[in-house]
Amino acid sequence: MVHWTAEEKATIASVWGKVDIEQDGHDALSRLLVVYPWTQRYFSSFGNLSNVSAVSGNVKVKAHGNKVLSAVGSAIQHLDDVKSHLKGLSKSHAEDLHVDPENFKRLADVLVIVLAAKLGSAFTPQVQAVWEKLNATLVAALSHGYF
């Protein structure tokens, strides 16, 4: 279990309060699919993902980005037990979707980039450190179903 200080929880809540789930989710998932094109194989039902314009204009990418960030938001509401909270999602990604767990880290990394671009100078090294701790917690919880 991860220990969160009151300050860390406040930082996460502050950053999350500035997140536009629909737009930032779309931006993060689009960036993942463009920067790591091999991840597109998990989204074959999304249609054309052949270039940046196709990815960024794809309504299924936008909807799934929203779904992903909604899950992050839900996990944030359960910081003291993220692993249990994400157990079902971990299991489905491992057993049904066969997603390489390294892709959770990649998505977490692109989300940091999206948030840093959005928040600018407010995304301080201290904020990034807390967000990286959150990402590590989320990635570990999502990867748990694989081991």
Swiss-Prot record:
GO terms for molecular function: heme binding; metal ion binding; oxygen binding; oxygen carrier activity. Heme b binds at residues 64, 93. Coiled coil: none annotated. Keywords: Heme, Iron, Metal-binding, Oxygen transport, Transport. Red blood cells. InterPro entries: Globin (IPR000971), Globin-like_sf (IPR009050), Globin/Proto (IPR012292), Hemoglobin_b (IPR002337), Hemoglobin_oxygen_transport (IPR050056). Residues 3-147 form the Globin domain. CDD domains: Hb-beta-like. SUPFAM superfamilies: Globin-like. It comes from the Eukaryota. Heterotetramer of two alpha chains and two beta chains. Belongs to the globin family. This is Hemoglobin subunit beta-2. It comes from Xenopus tropicalis (Western clawed frog). The lineage of its organism: Eukaryota, Metazoa, Chordata, Craniata, Vertebrata. The gene is hbb2.
